[in-house]
Regions:
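Soluble non-cytosolic domains of exported or imported proteins
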Residues: 54, 79-83, 104, 129-133, ...
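Conserved active-site neighborhood of the chymotrypsin/trypsin-like protease fold
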Residues: 13-100, 118-122, 178-191, 214-216
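C-terminal cap/linker of serine protease catalytic domains
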Residues: 1, 28, 46, 64-70, ...
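Catalytic nucleophile loop of clan PA
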Residues: 10-11, 128-149
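Beta-rich catalytic cores
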Residues: 5, 56, 134
């Protein structure tokens, strides 16, 4: 089937819940996930369960009779604020149309804990990311999720600033839902080599393909958005300018 965009996502539970970015899924009438258990020959239909445009977060769930399991989730969503200078790694599927559907890993540091006009939800990172990385996990030196890759900005002088949503905001989103708040994670407390981290995490990171039109072959299987929620938080109130700045950043990426 044809698709209009791609993104990345990562497992929240073995039974099919996946985190990604709202801007990846918000206009999609058809969402498919591939790369489950390393298999890119099979595509599974998914639906949006919960989303928050203010934090650019979305939770989807595989809704496909052929689906069995995502396997064990062996990482935590970090509840604390990242630290400037902290090493971090992006795992995802940038430009899958050109670079193929094997997972890509890039590294860098936390450049700033807050991302200026984009607001306290986001941290700035030096990790190279591009189209298709959106929704993928930003991993710390233990293999836990620090953030979710969201946006990037580049100017004519060559300055690049990439943004990730802090994982603590994903935890808040999950806690707003009576089902998702029951999800549990396994904190990894010991630092490991990058090769060990990638080996552990990569099978829980997936390629998401979206289409703005409903394909004829799947009309009976598509399920549209079940619920759209936004979390009320003091630091996110009256932030229309902040959100518009973020979307402007995305358009320039």
């Amino acid at each position: 089937d044809s698709y209009t965009g791609t993104g990345s996502g990562f497992a929240l539970s073995s039974d099919g819940y996946i985190a990604t970015c709202n801007h990846v899924t918000e206009d999609a009438k058809h969402i498919q996930v591939t790369g489950i258990n390393g298999d890119f020959t099979r595509f599974y239909n998914a639906q949006v369960i919960l989303s928050d445009p203010m934090t650019d977060l979305s939770v989807i769930k595989i809704n496909d009779p052929e689906f069995k399991t995502l396997g064990e989730v062996n990482y935590d969503l970090r509840p604390d604020v990242p630290v400037e200078g902290e090493p971090c790694y992006a795992i995802g599927y940038p430009r899958a149309d050109l670079l193929g559907d094997n997972v890509k890993v890039t590294n860098g540091i936390i450049s700033a804990v807050n991302a200026g006009k984009a607001g306290p939800v986001f941290c700035q990172i030096s990790v190279p990311v591009t189209y298709g990385n959106s929704g993928g996990p930003l991993i710390d030196g233990n293999g836990n999720v620090l953030g979710i890759i969201s946006a990037g900005y580049g100017d004519k002088a060559g300055y690049m600033a990439n943004l990730a949503v802090k994982a603590s905001y994903l935890k808040l989103l999950l806690e707003s839902d009576p089902v998702l708040r029951k999800l549990t994670f396994k904190p990894i407390l010991v630092k490991r080599s990058l090769t060990e981290i990638v080996r552990q995490v990569k099978d829980n990171v997936y390629l998401i393909k979206v289409s703005n039109s409903e394909p004829e072959s799947s009309k009976n299987n598509i399920v549209t958005d079940k619920s759209i929620n936004s979390i009320p938080r003091p630091e996110l109130q009256d932030n229309g300018n902040r959100v518009s700045v973020l979307y402007e950043v995305k358009e320039k990426h």
